[in-house]
Amino acid sequence: MLLAIDVRNTHTVLGLVSGTGEHAKVVQHWRIRTEAEITADELALTIDGLIGDDSETLTGVAALSTVPSVLHEMRGMFDQYWSSVPQVLIEPGVRTGLPLLVDNPKEVGADRIVNCLAAHHRFGSACIVVDFGSSICVDVVSAKGEFLGGAIAPGVQVSSDAAAARSAALRRVELTRPRSVVGKNTVECMQSGAVFGFAGLVDGLVERVRRDIDGFGAAGVTVVATGHTAPLILPETHTVDRYEEHLTLDGLRLVYERNRADQRGKARATR
């Protein structure tokens, strides 16, 4: 059983993955709040409390963190608590198999890399990957499996919360689909701006990518979405082809399997 850990700015997703290769499947997953000041000990206790007896069946761990402080503590947790379990922490220098054709590859977030890797592996085509997280990332991977870059916009919840925090007349609202695009009260107006506004943002960015990047206007390009708020926004979009709930966890599994295969190959070569 592989434990996949995806730490983002506001929330962390953990998943247990059974099987390998084409037979791999996320059998259980959790979503918890990210605590930027968490220690290695607290992180280990939290994870152990979630996975329970499954900790005895772990065959490996794959993890990423877009929060530097948590990334540091994860290294300590691995060394202290799981030193006997094979681990892959996605950071610069780790082999992913995805060439990064950008100005500074070290700037590309690990979450964006594994999402594009998983999408290309899953569909075998050029892909536009939309991740609805604390930021909305629209990333582009070529038919050859090359990361070409992307666009980043503020996320739905972050934008809604910021509007409420910076305006005396607005308050934090539940993000649900309103009755109409034309709201009849302040809450509905904010919900309309969030749901329909971000649907338009995603459609606009995807359409621009298709128009501006050679070869992406064709029918063979797959537009795939993931992320916690995707199910809220996707019904109002017209450009997204597929929704993959566990795309990031699948990408973590792929990187883990590739790095473990490399390590086994090197071990055999030295015998």
From Swiss-Prot:
Stored SUPFAM superfamilies: Actin-like ATPase domain
Catalytic site: D111 (proton acceptor)
Record's GO cellular component terms: cytoplasm
Pfam families xrefs: Pan_kinase
Transmembrane segments annotated in the record for this chain: none
Localization in the cell: Cytoplasm
Reaction catalysed by this enzyme: (R)-pantothenate + ATP = (R)-4'-phosphopantothenate + ADP + H(+)
The keyword Oxidoreductase belongs to this UniProt entry's keyword annotation: no
Record-linked InterPro entries: ATPase_NBD (IPR043129), Type_III_PanK (IPR004619)
Principal subcellular localisation of the protein: cytoplasm
CDD domains cross-referenced by the UniProt entry: ASKHA_NBD_PanK-III (cd24015)
Binding site for substrate: G109, A110, D111, R112, T186
Reported cofactor(s): NH4(+); K(+)
HAMAP family per record: Pantothen_kinase_3
Quaternary structure (record): Homodimer.
Entry protein name: Type III pantothenate kinase
Source organism of the structure: Mycobacteroides abscessus (strain ATCC 19977 / DSM 44196 / CCUG 20993 / CIP 104536 / JCM 13569 / NCTC 13031 / TMC 1543 / L948) (Mycobacterium abscessus)
Organismal lineage: Bacteria, Bacillati, Actinomycetota, Actinomycetes, Mycobacteriales
Gene: coaX
